[in-house]
Amino acid sequence: REQFAEEFGVSRQTVLKWENGTSYPELSKLIDISRRFDISLDSLILDRNMRMIEEFKGNYGKKTISPNYSNMHFWESYSSAIIDEYRQSVDEGLDIEEYKDIFFDISKLPQGAIKKKFGDVIFEIITEAKKRENYKYNEPSTLEEIKALSKPYNIGKKIDTDRLESKINGAWVGRVCGCMLGKSVEGIHTDELIPLLKNSGNYPMHRYILKSDIDAVDASKFKYDLINRPYADTIDGMPPDDDTNYTLLAQQIIDDYGFDFTPLNVLEAWVKYQPKEAYCTAERVAFCNFIKGYEPPCSAIYKNPYREWIGAQIRTDYYGYINPGNPEAAADMAWRDASISHIKNGIYGAMFVAAALSTAAISDNIEDIILSGLAHVPHTSRFYEDVMQVVNGYKNGISCKECFENIHEKYDEYTGYGWCHTNPNAMITVASLLYGEGNYGKSIC
């Protein structure tokens, strides 16, 4: 401070006042300062942020300020998921085959500004791409168009008020118990899961995985981290999980905004009640897009390679709970929630689950529940076709083993897309219900 005061012929106290904002330099002094430190006079007078940028230029010799891409989470970097984007776009029917090699070449680049720029170009290509002429599916994302392509299915039953509370309680407890069954090994692949289960006498699976099961194997031989996981014999209550968090968040949305909440209300609640780290894949992208100013439906579309992944399908249970026997109302709410982060089949999965749960409140017939859920998604969609493949296979006598083999053949669990896409997860859910034949334990295992 003394050196600065001497440099510009003022007192130390004057410099202190300039720093704390109680007084400001005369114009002649500002001109001297701008010349001495190579900072524009405009930036000194008008814009502190501009001054900071120019100081960076002077001090570090940089023409621009760039992020440290190594600090950027995978889900927040569009170019990091460029192969997922390719698979997603192809399945959507976009005519991008001529760019295939470019997608794969970009995926091999290290994280950085160059890869980001290539990703920006890819997004432009995707946005402007046309549908392939032979693409057989019609998959809208607006509620009106979805309804126009849905096939009605009315089971003709009324609410049994004596059983309703038990039904809804069972739905929530069942969700929690099923979630805990999988949480111990969430993310493990079958090539490691099956040997683990066999080693503990739990194959075919018929009970929870215990810490004692893990202690009996050499965990270091597994790629999957078996050590730092919750197990049924080491917990006191259900650990937090995004699957169940979203059910509570949906309840909060209804409490705050009522039954007529909007897609924008959902995003407002997301920002208000949970930090960014609580959201994954499509939800993380939508959250970040909203913070940047993108509102629904753009929040679901802009640089979102996860737009048909399972996130929306796990969020909409609550809308089924609060609309017992009214699957259309449940599906409508699910659409409002899902459309902030997903399109097409990603939305359909959410509507299917909400409608099916609404029907489950008044029926015990598994097939009726499934078909009622399907009545609220386009019959011209991949989702409808995939789920009906499971339903028809079951009715035609295909074994449970063959059913799951067919799902694995169509969707590769060893890719992020195959693992997390809405459709295979819906197929697995439907198969588990059908082949479980009303036995809850058999279905979740």
Roles of regions detected by a PLM:
Residues 149-161, 284-310, 316-346, 350-445:
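Accessory "access/gating" subregions that flank catalytic or transport cores
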